[in-house]
C-alpha cells in the first residue's frame, strides 16, 4: 500500500512516525508547503513529544527526497491538492492532515483512489472511528477519521452505552493550538 501524507504538523508527523516501520505500508511522499527539506532531519530528531527511533539513519537527497534507512520519501511543496501529482509516486492512499480539504469534492482534488481526512468533514463524508463504527466501512473512497476529541471520547461513551443509559454528558477537552490559530501572549 503506497501512502502520501498531506500536511506534516503534529498529526501528519505522528502518522508518519507510526507508519514508517509498518511493513504493509510504504510512505512515498509527504506534502509540506513552505518547508525546507534540509530541515527534515532536525524536525524528526528533535520532538519533545514523540521521540523518534534512534536507529533511523536519515539522509537528505538532491532530488527533493530523503531516506530513512532504505526508504526513500519525496517532499512535495504545494497548497493546491489538484497540483500534487501523487500518481507520479504510485500513491493510491492519501492521508490528509491539513484540515483544508474537508469535503468530498475538495478531497477528490488529490486524484487518488482513497483519501482519509484527519478532521471532521464539513459535508456528509462518512466518518469512522475505530472500535466505535469502523465495521460499517463499506469501501467508501473518501472518509473522515473524525477529530482527535471524538476519537478520545467516542470509545468511552460506547462502552458506557453498551451497559447503561446516558441522559446527558459533559466533558472538557484541552487542545494544543493549531497552525491556523493565533496565540495571544499577554
Predicted regions and their residues:
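N-terminal Rossmann-like NAD(P) cofactor-binding subdomain of oxidoreductases
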Residues: 1-183
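Anionic-ligand binding region
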Residues: 186
Amino acid at each position: 500500500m503506497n501512502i502520501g501524507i498531506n500536511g506534516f504538523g503534529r498529526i501528519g508527523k505522528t502518522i508518519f512516525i507510526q507508519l514508517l516501520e509498518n511493513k504493509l505500508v510504504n510512505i512515498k511522499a509527504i506534502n509540506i508547503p513552505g518547508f525546507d527539506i534540509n530541515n527534515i532531519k532536525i524536525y524528526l530528531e528533535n520532538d519533545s513529544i514523540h521521540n523518534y527511533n534512534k536507529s533511523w539513519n536519515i539522509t537528505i537527497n538532491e532530488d527533493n527526497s530523503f531516506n530513512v534507512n532504505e526508504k526513500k520519501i519525496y517532499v512535495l511543496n504545494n497548497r493546491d491538492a489538484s497540483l500534487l501529482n501523487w500518481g507520479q509516486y504510485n500513491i493510491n492512499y492519501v492521508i490528509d492532515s491539513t484540515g483544508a480539504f474537508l469535503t468530498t469534492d475538495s478531497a477528490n482534488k488529490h486524484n487518488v483512489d482513497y483519501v482519509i481526512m484527519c478532521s471532521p468533514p464539513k459535508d456528509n463524508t462518512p466518518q469512522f472511528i475505530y472500535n466505535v463504527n469502523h465495521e460499517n466501512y463499506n469501501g467508501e473512497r473518501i472518509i473522515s477519521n473524525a477529530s482527535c476529541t471524538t476519537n478520545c471520547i467516542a470509545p468511552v461513551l460506547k462502552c458506557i452505552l453498551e451497559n447503561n443509559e446516558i441522559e446527558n454528558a459533559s466533558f472538557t477537552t484541552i487542545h494544543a493550538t493549531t497552525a491556523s490559530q493565533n496565540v495571544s501572549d499577554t
